[in-house]
């Protein structure tokens, strides 16, 4: 059996998903493809890495196989018996660009196992299994947005997701006359995972200091009670949630000018308040600001490198791509990579 699961890009709502906040992602037309078949032992093969790993029983290797192994462990924890299988994986999702290739791999694995063994679990349960794999087995304290989007994606729609209640709404993504591109900075600073976890701790500290159970109970008034650093972190989360709500409204009204402005202000907040951007992504966003036909841009993903999402009028980005590429190369001696992004449906059999 063969399945595919898409990556995702988040239009807006960055670092809100683990704070019970709102997000506005959509599934993208880049996928992890996965084949599953019965086997005498567990065999995991990656076409992209040209590598095969065999194991008698599931174990943690601190490698790409952990995403698959973690999913199998999560099924077993729920009492499902997963006998040995051969899983072959290939992908046209760029790694590290902020399109969430890991969640796509987890989602493809969860869906394939559920169907192959006849468990036929509902999608939401598979989302929870996939996230558990990343949090408990791989050890990255992610929110639920990435796995949710890979499962529930719908072509020509974004998903307005409340990560606290998991209530969601499909918002039409009518891009006629507009386009979304991803610029990959091709840098990943060492800080990324340690600082990501540190931001999570800081947000937990905000709640502890304020005596609140959830960020949804935090108000602007509460910010005054916080020490400086925590105040900045909390202010970002509160204002980013407001930006998501405004962005949903803008999308519904087809108001891409407003959406673009919200992207720029999201980036400023990630740079100045949450402090997770870096010189390279700041350079890209600053370069794009004020250019003809460019409506908005911001860093996407955990930060400290990765990608920048760009919203523009159709054809406008194409005109300045080379200039951006050259300016970036002159400054950082690094080549940029560009991806035009289109929406896609969620995980499915092929």
From Swiss-Prot:
Binding residue positions for Mg(2+): 102, 134
GO CC terms: cytosol
Membrane-spanning parts: none
GO biological process, one term: galactose metabolic process
Annotated site residue numbers, Transition state stabilizer: 8
Chain residues that bind substrate: 14-17, 196
Recorded catalytic activity of this chain's protein: alpha-D-galactose + ATP = alpha-D-galactose 1-phosphate + ADP + H(+)
Subcellular location: Cytoplasm
Annotated Pfam families: GalKase_gal_bdg, GHMP_kinases_C, GHMP_kinases_N
GO MF: ATP binding; galactokinase activity; magnesium ion binding
Assigned keywords, A-Z: ATP-binding, Carbohydrate metabolism, Cytoplasm, Galactose metabolism, Kinase, Magnesium, Metal-binding, Nucleotide-binding, Transferase
SUPFAM superfamilies: GHMP Kinase, C-terminal domain, Ribosomal protein S5 domain 2-like
Chief localization: cytoplasm
Residues of the active site: 146 (proton acceptor)
EC number: 2.7.1.6
Annotated pathway: Carbohydrate metabolism; galactose metabolism
Residues engaged in binding ATP: 46, 96-102
Family: Belongs to the GHMP kinase family. GalK subfamily.
PANTHER family reported in the protein's UniProt record: GALACTOKINASE-RELATED (PTHR10457:SF7), MEVALONATE KINASE/GALACTOKINASE (PTHR10457)
Function, in words: Catalyzes the transfer of the gamma-phosphate of ATP to D-galactose to form alpha-D-galactose-1-phosphate (Gal-1-P).
Name of the protein described by the UniProt record: Galactokinase
Gene for this chain: galK
């Amino acid at each position: 059996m063969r399945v595919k699961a898409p990556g995702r890009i988040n239009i807006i709502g960055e670092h809100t998903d683990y704070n019970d906040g709102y997000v506005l992602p959509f599934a993208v037309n880049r996928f992890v493809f996965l084949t599953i078949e019965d086997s005498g032992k567990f065999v995991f093969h990656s076409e992209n890495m040209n590598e095969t790993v065999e194991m008698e029983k599931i174990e943690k290797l601190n490698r790409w196989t952990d995403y698959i192994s973690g999913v199998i462990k999560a099924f077993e924890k729920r009492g499902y018996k997963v006998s040995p299988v051969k899983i072959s994986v290939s992908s046209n999702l760029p790694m590290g660009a902020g399109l969430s290739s890991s969640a796509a791999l987890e989602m493809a694995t969860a869906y394939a196992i559920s169907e192959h063994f006849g468990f036929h679990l509902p999608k939401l349960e598979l989302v929870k299994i996939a996230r558990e794999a990343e949090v408990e087995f791989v050890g990255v304290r992610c929110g639920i947005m990435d796995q949710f989007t890979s499962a529930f994606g719908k072509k020509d729609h974004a998903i307005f997701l409340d990560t606290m209640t998991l209530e969601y709404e499909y918002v039409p993504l009518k891009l006629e006359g507009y386009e979304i591109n991803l610029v990959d900075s091709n840098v990943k600073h060492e800080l990324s995972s340690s600082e990501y976890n540190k931001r999570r701790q800081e947000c937990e500290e905000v709640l502890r200091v304020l005596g609140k159970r959830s960020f949804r109970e935090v108000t602007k008034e509460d910010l005054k009670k916080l020490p400086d650093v925590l105040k900045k972190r909390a202010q970002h989360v509160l204002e980013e949630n407001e930006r998501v709500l405004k962005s949903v409204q803008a999308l519904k009204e087809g108001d891409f000018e407003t959406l673009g402005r919200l992207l720029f202000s999201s980036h400023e907040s990630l740079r100045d308040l949450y402090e997770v951007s870096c010189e390279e992504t700041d350079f890209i966003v600053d370069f794009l600001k004020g250019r003809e036909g460019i409506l908005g841009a911001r860093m996407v993903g955990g930060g400290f490198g990765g990608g920048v999402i760009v919203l523009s009028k159709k054809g406008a980005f194409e005109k300045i791509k080379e200039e951006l590429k050259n300016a970036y190369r002159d400054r950082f001696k690094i080549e940029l990579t560009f991806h035009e992004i289109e929406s896609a449906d969620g995980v499915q059999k092929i």
